[in-house]
Amino acid sequence: WKALTDQVLLERYGMTEIGMGLSNPYVGERRAGHVGQALPGVDAQLFDEAQKPILEENVPGEIRIKGDNVFLEYWNNETATKESFVDGWFCTGDVAVLDKGYFRIMGRSSVDIIKSGGYKLSALEIEGTLLTHDDIAEVAVIGVEDETWGESVSAFVVLKPNKTLAYVDLKGWCDGKMSGYKIPKALHVVDALPRNAMGKVTKPALKALAS
């Protein structure tokens, strides 16, 4: 990209409510797969489900943001505004870990975090690995309610033309590429993944199919 455009790509993190909050530096270490550190004037902190700040690294938590960059309120929606703030922190709904001082996004807490066997798994991370399979064109990973695991990992895949894939073969391929508890326990081969008007995969629709 640098050779083609003479521009440098930066992985960053932002949303409508906060503008840009986290960024890899313009000058300095840029880490692939990470969204960097809080920008000047922005406070960023991970919180656990008990509303306590997470001080350790590599422990998943919700990103919360403070600063002059944060919006004041949702227009004519006092309830949504109140639900979005805790002790002055804006709750983004996104889960991340701190990795050597840099934030790494795991996904949306509502659809991309799978709670399985006591672990919090990133569907995005599993999807990224599965996309390196030679026969897989598209993939979406979800958590499906399970009496034993809480949620079990389930993969929906669109295969490349004229390819087939059995679950036993996928499981064997995953061995050594990801921890055993991350390996999908079910495989669904579909013609296409359901998407919304923005082109994003609608994982709730996949949950309905899986059940």
What is each stretch, according to the model?
Residues K2-A3, Q37, T132, G176:
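Solvent-exposed polar/charged
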Residues L10-T16, G36-A38, I142-E145, H188:
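Beta-strand->loop->alpha-helix junctions that form or flank phosphate-binding loops
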Residues G14, G67, L72-E73, E83, ...:
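AMP-binding/adenylate-forming catalytic core of the ANL superfamily
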Residues Q37-G41, K52-S84, Y102, L121:
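Conserved ATP/PPi-binding loop(s) of AMP-dependent carboxylate-activating enzymes
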Residues L39-V42, I136, P184:
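Core-facing hydrophobic residues within beta-strands of well-ordered domains
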Residues D43-A44, A192:
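Generic short beta-strand
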